[in-house]
């Protein structure tokens, strides 16, 4: 199985969300790269743009010895698909989790209004964010993984504006590498998962029972098993 895996985190969290997967993949001998996106984690305070987000993934993949398997969660999944659609270099595969709905402008603008209101709270929404995380992810260890690298409170407006430039069906249709779409059965953002699957050239849809939007943390063991199986399938298909 050894090779490289790039793990791209979601909105407002950071590379810390991947602790469980990093430990599992490292134990199997993989090189694991977990970049922080602009405005998140160690890059808190930077402005987020779609171009800089894509460049972050490109730099992470370039730094890793091949074959490289790319994984993205939510925001990271949208960015990974967008990047892979334009990427001339071969990758082993891509797993896009919890990004099963096209980010239409109307939806994004509604979220921007809501995010703006929350940002007016005295703590800019930190308490609300952490309360929601701990309510959705009952295991305190995994809930802490979400927030351990810092909570990106100031990046919402930039991200929701920039996501207008992502066209998931178009992106998925242009990716030659195998694609896995992984969603929790309780995820509210999987409305178009079948359309997205139909758009892929070589795609697999996996639903993890009982998992919410934060699938890799709500069901970490099950998610990691799916991820390892996906990586192994690409390794076995690669000519010696």
Across the structure, where does each feature detected by a protein language model lie?
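Gly/Ala-rich beta-loop-alpha elbow adjacent to hydrolase catalytic centers
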Residues: 72-76, 80
């Amino acid at each position: 199985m050894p090779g490289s895996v790039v793990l791209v985190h979601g909105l407002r969290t950071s590379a810390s969300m991947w602790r469980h997967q990093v430990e599992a993949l490292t134990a199997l001998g993989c090189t694991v790269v977990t970049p922080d996106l602009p405005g998140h984690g160690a890059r808190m305070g930077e402005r987020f743009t779609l171009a800089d987000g894509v460049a972050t993934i490109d730099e992470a993949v370039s730094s890793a010895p091949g074959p490289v398997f790319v994984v993205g969660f939510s925001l990271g999944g949208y960015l990974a698909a967008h990047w892979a659609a334009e990427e001339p270099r071969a990758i082993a595969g891509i797993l896009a989790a919890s990004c099963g709905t096209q980010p239409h402008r109307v939806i994004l603008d509604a979220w921007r209004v809501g995010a703006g209101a929350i940002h007016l709270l005295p703590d800019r929404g930190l308490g609300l964010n952490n309360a929601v995380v701990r309510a959705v992810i009952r295991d305190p260890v995994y809930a802490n993984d979400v927030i351990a690298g810092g909570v990106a409170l100031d990046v919402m407006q930039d991200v929701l504006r920039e996501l207008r430039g992502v066209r998931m069906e178009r992106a998925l249709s242009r990716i030659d590498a195998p694609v896995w779409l992984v969603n929790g059965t309780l995820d509210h953002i999987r409305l178009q998962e079948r359309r997205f699957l139909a758009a892929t050239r070589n795609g697999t849809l996996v639903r993890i029972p009982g998992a919410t939007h934060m699938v890799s943390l709500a069901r970490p063991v099950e998610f990691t098993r799916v991820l390892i199986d996906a990586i192994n399938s690409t390794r076995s298909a690669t000519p010696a």
